[in-house]
């Protein structure tokens, strides 16, 4: 990868960025280049490389220096291991040696915008840039053909973090300390090499194999980014439960990774997230308040040292928050062998399993939703833009947007229309050009109706009765359930079935999907816009005080 493998320095990174911007500019349509000449900042979400209007012979190139084009020449792809927003992970076998690997195949049809493409490109750059580490999955080879990008990686067969904990008969504070140390060592190594992870959560860690001594490995760097000392970031990314307050304030640095690791530690010790609410806005407000509950079971039995570390990692002021080295130097992690080896109780294990399986229930639904987020969704947007643009100046102002939304059936207060306008109006000129409108339209199609959520519900409602019954839930989650599966199924039904009729209605399913998390993360673009919009809303109602962090 040439310069991509060098530790980012200020001047070197600047040259690299200039080269990328120059290449990017050559790809942009004339209209966007003209906008830049006028000092207008284009919306990166709207630069669509997969549109049918692309020049004849245009071939989307994602990776800078792939290993090759034909993955089948060296590897044989096997069964599916998992599915995400952009692609599918397969078991793959090296033909020459018979060694097994994981292959993440990313469909180019799913990479609609410049941001999507840059995310994949940067993920590869970062995995190649980071030195070999026992707790980070190794990227072996990369391939790119006309249809997809293929990332061949080390295979992790030991399962997810919470599943391993639940499977063990005895779960203690000492076990939580060992996991925390591993996660923070990964954070420390990333920061040392100029990488901020930005999406630390239990699902992004897998065990290498099923042995008791298996290494825990970080597997996903899709939202990670290079940084230089003192550099601040404004883009809202990550997963709601694990998001630091300064991310919502859109002014953050690598300290956010320690916060996320602190959230994981809190969950490891008591089985529930520290900041939770019924809505994503409620979660955001809980994060901003940063009040930590140490009263619920089992906290009275947890050592003072463990609580002290949680407080240090979840300090809402990033300047006073512990850094990765300070976390590793903390007495609780320095004296792991002295950490209490007393069972934290079945309550914590049950909560962890419920939290894990509920996430998997949502993930199954997200998978169905993601499969329906096709390129065809943006069809007709140009026609909609022209109809809304009443004065034909190729821009949509506030009044045109409000009237157009009304005609489309979106009954919105002026304040909410303004929030949408602020979120989509990247250049801040008070009007939306076509590029900004493309991003907003994809956003509106998610909040205007729940067609994708209906499709996900229909997937679980296999007998089309209008309800998800206990047998259907059991069958859908069969691969994710352990020995005490009936207990978990009953816990899910108990939580989701609010009218207590023994089955899950569509309204109950929709409420679960929207509670405390952003189900629309099936579209990463949408999620970014959604949380930017939420941040603006909280700022306006006084919940969010934007402060400058040195």
UniProtKB/Swiss-Prot annotation:
Pfam families: EF-hand_7, Pkinase. Ca(2+) 3 binds at residues 461, 463, 465, 467, 472. Keywords: ATP-binding, Calcium, Kinase, Lipoprotein, Membrane, Metal-binding, Myristate, Nucleotide-binding, Repeat, Serine/threonine-protein kinase, Transferase. It catalyses: L-seryl-[protein] + ATP = O-phospho-L-seryl-[protein] + ADP + H(+); L-threonyl-[protein] + ATP = O-phospho-L-threonyl-[protein] + ADP + H(+). Residues 339-369 are annotated as: Autoinhibitory domain. GO terms for biological process: intracellular signal transduction. SUPFAM superfamilies: EF-hand, Protein kinase-like (PK-like). Activated by calcium. Autophosphorylation may play an important role in the regulation of the kinase activity. Ca(2+) 2 binds at residues 425, 427, 429, 431, 436. Residues 75-333 form the Protein kinase domain. Induction: By N-acetylchitooligosaccharide elicitor. Induced by UV-C. The active site is at residue 199. It is a lipid-anchor. GO terms for cellular component: cytoplasm; nucleus; plasma membrane. Gene3D superfamilies: EF-hand, Phosphorylase Kinase, domain 1, Transferase(Phosphotransferase) domain 1. Ca(2+) 1 binds at residues 389, 391, 393, 395, 400. Its EC number is 2.7.11.1. A lipid is attached at residue 2 (N-myristoyl glycine). Residues 1-58 are annotated as: Disordered. Residues 18-30 have a biased composition (Basic and acidic residues). Residues 376-411, 412-447, 448-483, 484-519 form the EF-hand domain. There are 3 contiguous domains conserved in the CDPK subfamily: a kinase domain, an autoinhibitory (junction) domain and a calmodulin-like domain. The autoinhibitory domain (339-369) inactivates kinase activity under calcium-free conditions. This is Calcium-dependent protein kinase 20. It comes from Oryza sativa subsp. japonica. The gene is CPK20.
């Amino acid at each position: 990868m040439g310069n991509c493998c060098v530790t980012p320095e200020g001047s070197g990174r600047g040259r690299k960025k200039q080269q990328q911007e120059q290449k990017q500019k050559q790809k942009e349509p004339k209209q966007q280049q003209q906008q830049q000449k006028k000092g207008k900042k284009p919306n990166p979400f709207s630069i669509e490389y997969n549109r049918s209007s692309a020049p004849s012979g245009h071939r989307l190139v994602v990776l800078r220096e792939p290993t090759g084009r034909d993955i089948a020449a060296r590897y044989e792809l096997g069964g599916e291991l998992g599915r995400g927003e952009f692609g599918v992970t397969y078991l793959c076998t090296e033909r020459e040696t018979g060694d097994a690997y994981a292959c993440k195949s990313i469909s180019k049809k799913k990479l609609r915008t410049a941001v999507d493409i840059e995310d994949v490109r940067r993920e590869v750059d970062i995995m190649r840039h980071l030195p070999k580490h026992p707790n980070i999955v190794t990227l072996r080879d990369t391939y790119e053909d006309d249809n997809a990008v293929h990332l061949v990686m080390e295979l992790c067969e030991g399962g997810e973090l919470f599943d391993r904990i639940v499977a063990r008969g005895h779960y203690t504070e000492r076990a939580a300390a060992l996991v925390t140390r591993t996660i923070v060592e990964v954070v420390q190594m990333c920061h040392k090499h100029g990488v901020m992870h930005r999406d630390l959560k239990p699902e992004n860690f897998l065990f290498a194999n099923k042995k008791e001594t298996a290494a825990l490995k970080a597997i996903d760097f899709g939202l990670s980014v290079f940084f230089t000392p003192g550099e601040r970031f404004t883009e809202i990314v990550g997963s709601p439960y694990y998001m630091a307050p300064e991310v919502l304030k859109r002014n953050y640095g690598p300290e956010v990774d320690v916060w996320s690791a602190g959230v994981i530690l809190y969950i490891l010790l008591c089985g529930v997230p520290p900041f939770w609410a019924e809505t994503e806005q409620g979660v955001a407000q809980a994060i901003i308040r940063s009040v930590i509950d140490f009263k619920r079971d089992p906290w009275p039995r947890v050592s003072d040292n463990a609580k002290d570390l949680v407080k240090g990692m979840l300090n809402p002021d990033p300047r006073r928050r512990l850094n990765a080295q300070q976390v590793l130097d903390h007495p609780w992690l320095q004296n792991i062998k002295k950490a209490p080896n007393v069972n934290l109780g079945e309550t914590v294990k049950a909560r962890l399993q419920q939290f894990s399986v509920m996430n998997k229930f949502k993930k199954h639904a997200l998978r169905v939703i993601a499969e329906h987020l096709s390129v065809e969704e943006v069809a007709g947007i140009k026609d909609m833009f022209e109809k809304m643009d009443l004065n034909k100046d190729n821009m949509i102002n506030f009044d045109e947007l409000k009237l157009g939304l009304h005609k489309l059936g979106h009954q919105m207060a002026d304040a909410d229309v303004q929030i949408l306008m602020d979120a989509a109006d990247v250049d801040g000129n008070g009007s939306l050009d076509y590029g900004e409108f493309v991003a907003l339209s994809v956003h509106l199609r998610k909040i205007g109706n729940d067609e994708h959520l209906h499709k996900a519900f229909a997937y679980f409602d296999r007998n089309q009765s209008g309800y998800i019954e206990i047998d259907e839930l059991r069958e859908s989650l069969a691969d994710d359930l352990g020995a005490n599966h009936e207990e978990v199924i009953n816990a899910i039904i108990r939580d989701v079935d609010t009218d207590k009729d023994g089955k899950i209605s569509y309204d109950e399913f929709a409420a679960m999907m929207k509670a405390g998390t952003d189900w629309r993360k099936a579209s990463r673009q949408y999620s970014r816009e959604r949380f930017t919009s939420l941040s603006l809303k909280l700022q306006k109602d006084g919940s969010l005080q934007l402060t400058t962090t040195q």
